[in-house]
Design a protein with these regions (language model features):
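Active-site acidic/histidine proton-transfer and metal-coordination neighborhood
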Residues: 1-85, 95
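Histidine-acidic metal/acid-base catalytic patches
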Residues: 49, 66-88, 92-173
């Protein structure tokens, strides 16, 4: 519950849309917005933001509803509350839609958190994958974002701590 999240000192909680299960995008937005409109005021009362994660439905989360930026933005507009935002997972959105930097710039007001991960494979964000994270981080900084960027990858190297340190270094712009 939001009260527990606030008591623990956290300012946001991540939520998920669930799967399509045959629903149209419009019906999914309507259903999610209906539920979120009940939750968001409670979270707001406790100073907590609700953040829905954008995930890919091609590789990792088959049938997931909130699998593209446009759908997420429409949901934010339907909820109509500053206390509800999106988590832009760079790994997932590269798989689903590409055009990462332009999408971040275009929808910056809807994003309140970011996750990293190398594509393909969700490994380190180094030269072994297709994204150039220094440019992505510069774009995020240019939007005025001052929050955290979470390193959310599965280390392929022998030392996970070294991989994490490298990821932090790559993102330190």
């Amino acid at each position: 519950p939001p009260a527990d999240v606030a008591a623990a000192g956290f300012k946001s909680i991540i939520c998920f849309s669930g799967n399509r299960e045959g629903m149209s995008e419009e019906e999914g937005i309507k259903n999610c917005a209906k539920g979120l409109k009940q939750i968001v005021p409670i979270a707001y009362k406790h100073g907590v933001k609700i953040v829905m994660e954008l995930l890919n439905s091609k590789v990792n989360h088959e049938d997931y509803m909130c699998d593209n930026s446009i759908w997420g933005v429409k949901l934010c507009d339907a909820v109509g509350a500053d206390e509800f935002k999106l988590l832009y997972d760079i790994y997932h959105m590269q798989i689903m839609e590409g055009d990462v930097i332009a999408t971040i710039r275009k929808n910056q007001d809807y994003y309140s958190h970011y996750h990293t991960g190398g594509v393909p494979g969700r490994h380190e964000i180094d030269k072994t994958q297709e994204l150039y994270y220094p440019a992505i981080m510069e774009a995020i900084v240019e939007t005025g974002y001052t929050g955290y960027v979470a390193q959310e990858f599965i280390p392929a190297g022998p030392d996970p701590l070294t991989s994490l340190k490298q990821g932090v270094h790559i993102c330190d712009v």
